[in-house]
């Protein structure tokens, strides 16, 4: 599933300022290509974003705790998005709204206290009653109670066939009682993972040490030294100069300055999509939508804007979901073959919106304008910061809108995204789209438990959406991860939940 290593053209000198900005950042770093030299087996990590909420697991900061292997959840997900044992060894559905989880024995928290069912119930209850509600529980009415020392029953107001997958979200990490003693949840010395979070330096960095009493395999590295480095040039310099062992999200523009053997492309569950307003304006006509679809040259956008470091979209769901392509069978194509023929569009005026927060989107808009105008459309662009354009986009103020959209949310399942964007009652329906057949397909998929039947139903719903040209998927994004030559076992995870694990080393 890992994309091939990128090919760089040359090694260029990077900014001296960027190099100086990283000097001294990592306690274990050294110059050259082997930052963990001289017997130092700690891993130095340069991350893109600093914590925004004090590393509370009830926020998106939870994903940092997960990527450091400091906090763990009841279950994990495999490549197909199916639940696997973690802090829970088994689970069963005792009624449509009740699931019982058996808790792993012999697990200790980092503060030395043993894991018991009451700890699980406490953590899940804290998440369920938090304000604001963690994203994974948005719209979910859930309670958790310990049945005894080793089992916990989770109850939902309505049937939730994906509850085990939901339990895999880092926002539902299980922490020791000590984490909940203050006004905010404090993960320091409170997780169960192979690394102990021992210190956090505000928005600058964090320190983790090997947890010798981990219930699984003892960590290969003695610790992790984390620095938060928002500047992309500085992150790239950290890898090139050997200041960091592992680097998140290297900008495409910096890849040419780094040894090609140190950079890896990871497919992301994110699709750059052109949403068409199906309710009003020119694109209310399906034949005009078909004309827009036929006008778009996806490969040119990938090669021009993304320098080839993205995947041409074959559907709404991309390579980050490895099962999706195999599900697009003859029945899928039969549905797509029902799309109308394109109408002539000479002189048809359309408004095209996007935002500047993702630097590539205005460039995509320029490419799209050229392609659409070559087909006969007259395009008027409207590009703003996202905070100033989102409300207009949701209200249907544009004929077309470009969005880089996450297709898999916290449960590892794309149904929530498809419903939000394409159901009649969808909360993020930029296409102003409503079709009974699509709603029926989405409801069928949502009702099925995780597994082959649900995956087939998801792709069937995708076909119904694309057959109506409610949106035109253009490309699937990749993220570029940097790893020093000495690094082994760093995880290249499309879900961005795992990065440094007990198997990671930098020797």
Regions found by a protein language model. Name each.
Residues 168-217, 223:
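Gly/Pro-rich hinge or "lid" segments in bacterial periplasmic/extracellular proteins
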Residues 387-389, 419-484:
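Extracytoplasmic/peripheral linker and loop segments enriched in polar/acidic and small residues
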Residues 481-507:
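Long beta-strand-rich cores associated with HINT superfamily self-processing modules
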Residues 307-344, 358-361:
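Structural transition elements
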Residues 116-123, 149-155, 193-194, 221-223, ...:
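Alpha-helical secondary-structure segments
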Residues 211-256:
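Ligand-site clamp/hinge motif
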């Amino acid at each position: 599933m890992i994309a091939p290593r990128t090919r760089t053209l040359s090694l260029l000198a990077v900014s001296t300022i960027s190099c100086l900005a990283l000097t001294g950042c990592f306690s274990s770093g050294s110059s050259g290509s082997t930052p963990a030299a001289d017997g130092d087996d700690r891993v130095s990590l340069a991350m893109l974003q600093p914590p925004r909420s004090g590393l509370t697991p009830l926020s998106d900061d939870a994903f940092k705790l997960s990527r450091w292997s400091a906090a763990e959840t009841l279950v994990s997900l495999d490549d197909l998005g199916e639940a696997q044992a973690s802090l829970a060894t088994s689970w069963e559905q005792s009624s449509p709204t009740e699931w019982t989880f058996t808790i792993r024995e012999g697990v200790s928290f980092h503060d030395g206290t043993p894991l018991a069912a009451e700890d699980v119930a406490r953590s899940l209850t804290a998440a369920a009653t938090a304000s604001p509600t963690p994203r994974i529980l948005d719209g979910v009415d859930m309670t958790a109670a310990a049945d005894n020392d080793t089992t916990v029953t989770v109850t939902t107001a309505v049937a939730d066939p994906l509850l085990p997958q939901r339990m895999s979200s880092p926002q539902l990490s299980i922490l020791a009682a000590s984490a909940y003693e203050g006004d905010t949840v404090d993960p320091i010395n409170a997780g169960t993972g192979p690394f102990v979070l021992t210190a956090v330096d505000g928005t600058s960095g964090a320190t983790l040490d090997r947890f010798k009493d981990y219930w699984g395999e003892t960590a290969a590295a003695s610790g992790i030294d984390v620095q938060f480095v928002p500047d992309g040039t500085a992150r790239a310099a950290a890898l090139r100069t050997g200041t960091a062992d592992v680097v998140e999200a290297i900008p495409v523009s910096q890849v040419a300055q780094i040894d090609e053997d140190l950079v890896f492309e990871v497919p992301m569950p994110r699709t750059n999509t052109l949403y068409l307003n199906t309710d009003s304006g020119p694109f209310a006509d399906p034949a005009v939508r078909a004309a827009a679809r036929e006008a778009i040259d996806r490969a040119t956008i990938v090669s021009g804007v993304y320098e080839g470091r993205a995947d041409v979209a074959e559907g709404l769901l991309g390579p980050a979901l490895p099962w999706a392509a195999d599900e697009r069978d003859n029945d899928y194509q039969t549905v797509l073959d029902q799309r109308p023929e394109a109408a002539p569009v000479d002189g048809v005026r359309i408004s095209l919106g996007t935002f500047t927060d993702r630097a590539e989107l205005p460039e995509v808009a320029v490419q799209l304008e050229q392609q659409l105008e070559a087909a006969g459309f007259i395009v008027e662009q409207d590009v703003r910061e996202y905070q100033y354009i989102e409300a207009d986009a949701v209200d249907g103020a544009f004929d077309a809108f470009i969005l880089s959209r996450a297709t898999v949310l916290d449960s590892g399942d794309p149904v929530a995204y498809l419903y939000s964007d394409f159901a009649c009652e969808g909360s993020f329906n930029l296409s102003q789209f409503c079709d009974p057949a699509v709603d029926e397909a989405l409801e069928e998929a949502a009702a099925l438990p995780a597994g082959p039947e649900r995956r087939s139903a998801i792709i069937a719903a995708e076909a119904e959406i694309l057959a109506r040209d409610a949106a035109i998927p253009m490309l699937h994004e990749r993220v570029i991860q940097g790893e020093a030559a000495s690094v082994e076992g760093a995880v290249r995870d499309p879900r961005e939940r795992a990065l440094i694990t007990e198997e990671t080393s930098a020797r």
